[in-house]
Amino acid sequence: VLLCLMVFRNADLGIHTGQSTMLLALFFVIMTVCPHLANQFSPVLGMLLNIAALAVLILFGCHNPSMFNQSTLVLGYLLLYGYDVTGKSYQMRLVGMALGAALTCFVFYRNHKNRTYKRNLKDLIQEFDITSSRTKWQICQILCVPIVLCIAELCNMPRAMWAGIAAMSAILPFMEDMHYRVRKRIVGNIAGVICFTVLYFLLPSSI
């Protein structure tokens, strides 16, 4: 909630403020309900639900890659997925998310109501073009993140959400940036494993 509030007080969705505000409310509903439901299903069924949920978040909330709204919406979704709760705790989460949605929408509308946007929700749908680099990036996010999550869960990896977060952060709108980040991440991961292994054997077990 705090992340959304801090981001969307300045960032926008590139369309009419009223429609953007309604979309924000919808995003909160999706982030509140879908991660919890996906955790109740098998990894494969959960993957399908995650694909559907992320499709709405990314296609309508991440239309402008330069805003990096995926770092807010997709990250928030994955964190809620990874730290799922049940019972009384989930009821408290519902209350917290509802209050957070109301506050975020209020701040967003107040800060953007005087701005003029030429596009609306219909324009976002019409601009979906499978041949454009933006749409290809969106589809890659929509499909790859849930697939990586599913694979991690099928392999019984603890906190599979971190695999999804790693995939999300590596899938960038511009191909040259993505290639650069992936190369650097491979080198960094190898160096990290080596350092951890060395420290594991050098440091006393009492630490």
Predicted regions and their residues:
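Alpha-helical transmembrane segments and their membrane-interface boundaries
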Residues: V1-I207
